[in-house]
Design a protein with these regions (language model features):
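Residue-level recognition of single "structural anchor" positions
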Residues: 1-330
């Protein structure tokens, strides 16, 4: 007698196992040269679990087991592998957490933590590596958002005032955002933290990856302190660079002979993109900026390549780390 399987459950199970096995094969995962817990280079194969190779550390003080998934961004994600692919694709389509949860049949809390696990992995793996020639530097200001905060307690009067302020545009835009972009490269977008200035933000994140004779270009509306900092920086450029771009320093401004093409207004696109999320807590905003930089990049990525890139290079981030890394300091 042939066993009935009208719902083709066995085929579905086989596809799931085959996909999981393919995901974690030797070519797709990080190869271990040492124990991820103690650093010992002495470890042995220790069987398989769900067709995934496991290992055991031979260090007497450790003796922990680990596998190809131990430091993967997908560690502890108990749902089917297909959902991990689908979730990245939905993120790229700016789908809300509610819609992701409904479509993938997961809880909103799970969707939230999946999103931030991926954000952390993307932030470690996809970032501007170097600026070489002409960098367009700009500043952008936004209001502070306390969405999801448990330490910020509002009275009814506070809520009424906040609603009134938003209605009439009275909310102070006191969060400064630094934008640095070079044609053909991934832009750098970063919020200025509470304990730093816009100048520190620029020096620590843009100058750090800029080539020696990189020209920093800005416009009239940029932050005055930042403009002055850029002026002092550009004065030190070599004569060859100044001649190349036709730089003339006139008082407190710089003129050049760079032909201005029709440049995309990155701030307008960024604001429109963020508005789809219906409010983002300021403590998380840098992750969204970094994700937008990936989307805005002229280099084309697809969700499959991102998945396997994060699988190989993205580091695992626990829920506990996500919570402690974003302590509410308002």
């Amino acid at each position: 007698m042939i066993e009935r399987d009208w719902e083709f459950e066995k085929i579905k199970k086989y596809k799931e196992n085959a996909l999981r096995e393919n995901i974690y094969n030797k070519g797709n995962v990080k190869k271990y040269k040492e124990c991820p817990y103690c650093g010992s280079k002495s470890f042995i194969k220790y069987g398989n679990y769900n067709r995934i190779q496991r290992y055991k550390c031979k260090n007497e003080e450790c003796k922990k087991t680990f596998s190809n998934t131990t430091n993967s961004v997908w560690k502890y994600l108990k749902h089917k592998p297909e959902k991990w692919f689908e979730f990245i694709e939905l993120m790229g389509e700016h789908t809300t957490l509610n819609e992701c949860a409904a479509k993938l049949e997961i809880s909103i809390v799970t969707a939230f933590y999946w999103r931030h696990k991926i954000f952390h992995a993307i932030e470690n793996n996809y970032k501007p590596e170097k600026f070489d020639e002409v960098v367009y530097v700009d500043t952008y200001y936004t209001e502070k958002c306390y969405k999801g905060s448990r330490n910020k307690n509002y009275t009814y009067a506070d809520k009424v005032k906040n609603k009134f302020d938003k209605m009439y545009g009275l909310v102070p835009r006191n969060v400064s955002v630094l934008i640095a972009e070079e044609r053909g490269k991934m832009p750098l977008i970063r919020r200025t933290e509470n304990d730093e200035t816009i100048i520190n933000n620029f020096n620590n994140n843009v100058l750090k990856i800029a080539a020696k004779d990189c020209y920093m270009r800005t416009d009239y509306f940029a932050n005055k302190k930042l403009k002055n900092n850029l002026l002092q920086y550009n004065k030190k450029l070599s004569n060859a660079t100044k001649k190349k771009y036709g730089l003339k320093i006139i008082g407190n401004r710089i003129e050049d002979k760079i032909k201005e093409d029709k440049k995309k207004n990155i701030m307008a696109y960024l604001t429109a993109w963020l508005s789809r999320y219906k409010g983002i807590a300021t403590k998380y905003i840098n992750h969204y900026y970094n994700f937008y930089s990936l989307i805005d990049s002229e280099k084309v990525f697809d969700y499959m390549s991102i998945f396997f890139e994060l699988l190989k290079n993205g580091s695992y981030t626990s829920v506990e780390v996500l919570r402690t890394n974003h302590v509410e300091d308002y």
